Amino acid sequence: CRKKEEDIMKNMLNFKNFSAEELQKILDLALDMKKNPEKYSHALEGKKLYTLFEKTSTRTFLSFTTGMTELGGTYYNQLWKDSNFVLGEPVSEIKYVCRNVDIIMARLVKNETVELFGDNVTVPFINGCDNSYHPCQILADALTIIEKFGSLNVKFLYIGAKNNVFNSLVEFFSKMKQGTLYGLTP
């Protein structure tokens, strides 16, 4: 039996469907979890995370699986190439995965595939990275800024390509309306 719609957190495809208040709540919760890990050590007890990697990443794998374990849950990891997703019927695979787990995190090559997941999941879905967005990286960066400077009200300079990180930074700072983002891109 799945939770009622209003009890399911929003899918984290990017920041478009999140308000500044919702993003701030996520950051506040993350800060509290870091400060009081014992308070959350059973928060996800009995919950199962499915991690799917089309794009490899040691850091993404370890951060999600360690986090899930520290919160009392379990995880199942799969590489895209070792899954039935490669057979070309992703919607039926998405539905099957949703019947067996409580949350999905996928690091995928194309944003279109992330959107396909977002349109078809019945459990919360987190975009671990795609060619257009990298929301989890930006949340981690924002948390570090808050820890080091006390707030997001900083001048932030991004130097690099206009890529998924840049897109998510622009989206995040536009939502939060705190601080100033400067970008030097080729």
Language model feature labels by segment:
Residues M9-L62:
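Positively charged, low-complexity intrinsically disordered leader regions
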Residues C1-M9:
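Short, Lys/Arg-enriched N-terminal segments with co-localized hydrophobic residues
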Residues K16, C129, T185:
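Residues at the C-termini of beta-strands that transition into short coil/loop
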Residues H42-I146:
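Phosphate/diphosphate ligand-binding glycine-rich loop within oxidoreductases
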Residues E21-L23, M33, D119-Y133, S151-F156, ...:
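Short secondary-structure transition/capping segments
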Residues E54-T66, K148-P186:
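Glycine-rich phosphate/diphosphate-binding loop of Rossmann-like nucleotide-binding domains
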